[in-house]
Amino acid sequence: MPNNNIYSTVEKLNHFKQKELRIHAIIIALNEEDFIAETIKPIYDHCSGISIITQYDRDYYGRMIEPDATIKKVLDYPDPEGKIHLVVRRYNDETASRNHEMNAVLFDASKNIQTHGVDKALIQGFHKPPDYFLICDADEIFDIATFPAIVEYLEKKKPDGMRISGYNYYFTWNRREPREKYVHRHFGFVKAGIFFQQRRVINWNESRINKWMAKIGLPKFGSYVYNFIDCPWEVGMMHHAGYVRRDKTQLIEKMQKHSHLEAHPPEFLEAILSKEYEFTDSKNLPINIQKGNWPDSFFEKK
């Protein structure tokens, strides 16, 4: 049973008033016990809400999997402000699951209700829709030192969508792919009311227009039309641990649960295992990664 005393505190009401830009995070997590708490840490203070979507014991193809402690990690996470929403639902499509939760968060359920004793302002504050959604997977970790600058950049530019670039890591946090060769890059922020067409793609026409207009020297024209921008690397990046796993077996299991199996033929694993990387000393990693609660195997010494 919830502690109703929290609903009578001034601090609770102030929480809903104090943040000018409201950001609600949407995180999809399936067997991510090693990452989920560390994903929440750098964003918690900057979000009005955080939805963790999981199917618990199924992947998006309806196949049974052995669940790990992901849900327990979410339930055990310190959440004094009641921001974290754990969503356990049987979905069969990644895009639809993300859009469904975004739509649910946007619905103001506080309208036209009669309360049972809770301050109406608190109910309205809880259901106040966000300005933006932060979209990330459970293995996309932001730098706690630079995430505020990313939010400030978002608030300044006011785009309809903003892509975030991320470093890729392989097996351990010390094996990083040079960003000059490749960066993990997806929409990290989308304006409330905008939904996805496929996975992290908002509108395929953006890339089509960019491709056509590149022929006349306007490669970003489609992005301009849709008011989509990229967050500059110097402002902030995230750290993609998609291939950081305890061993090769767990990496294979991770890849088999992806919703984009068509992009992972058998030779893909070998390509991952043979990737060139630069050794990154642990002291040069974000402080929240350095001090995170990780398995010992996630770090190595040169």
Give the predicted meaning of each segment.
Residues 42-92:
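Acidic donor-binding segment of Leloir-type glycosyltransferases
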Residues 31-39, 52-60, 98:
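Long alpha-helical, hydrophobic tracts
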Residues 26-28, 53, 241:
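Short hydrophobic segments within beta-strands
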Residues 2-16, 94-103, 110-125, 131-135, ...:
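Catalytic-site signature of metal-activated, phosphate-bearing donor transferases
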Residues 1-45, 302:
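N-proximal low-complexity "stem/linker" segments adjacent to membrane-targeting elements
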